[in-house]
């Protein structure tokens, strides 16, 4: 009798554990870059912060797509060192035209990876919107901690340009941001007449 009860209990535990293991594997497989916590008050999450103290304007720059990704990996892992190196390299290439006149602020963000652009527009939007949430969070941190009287330039290339356009649509109806803005350069992305 005890053996039967023990065997029944053992089988029940094994079944529960195997179900939990299958569930846990599903969770692990669905781990995403968005399981990582991003805190823009930590300078680790900025590629550039206030580089150029004596410059007359502030530049909020959003890097282009640099993560080649893999099938099923549609947003970059912000803590991945290879991603950060590629991100810094691309950012440095783009900033040459701004360096003489601006303090540079460039956040790392969990950008959409190249495979995203092979998805349907609806699917793309999930990953691009997720990337935008990082950019918005970084911009709000930047705006709260920089001099509101300094001229502001927004710039981005490719996906970075898309993020700049989204930022302007989302936040730049507000006077505190409008007053600062002197130029926006969303280069390498479609800008409609309505968006101008």
Segments predicted by a language model, with ranges:
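Bacterial N-terminal signal peptides that target proteins for export
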Residues: 1-10
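Flexible, membrane-associating and regulatory peripheral segments of lipid-active enzymes
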Residues: 5, 25-96
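Sec-dependent signal peptide cleavage junction
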Residues: 19-25
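Extracellular/periplasmic catalytic domains that process cell-envelope and extracellular macromolecules
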Residues: 52-55, 98-100, 146-147, 175-178
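Active-site catalytic motif of lipid deacylating hydrolases and related acyltransferases
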Residues: 62-151
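Surface cap/lid and interfacial helix-loop subdomains adjacent to catalytic sites
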Residues: 134-148, 169-196
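Gly/Ala-rich beta-loop-alpha elbow adjacent to hydrolase catalytic centers
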Residues: 156-160, 164
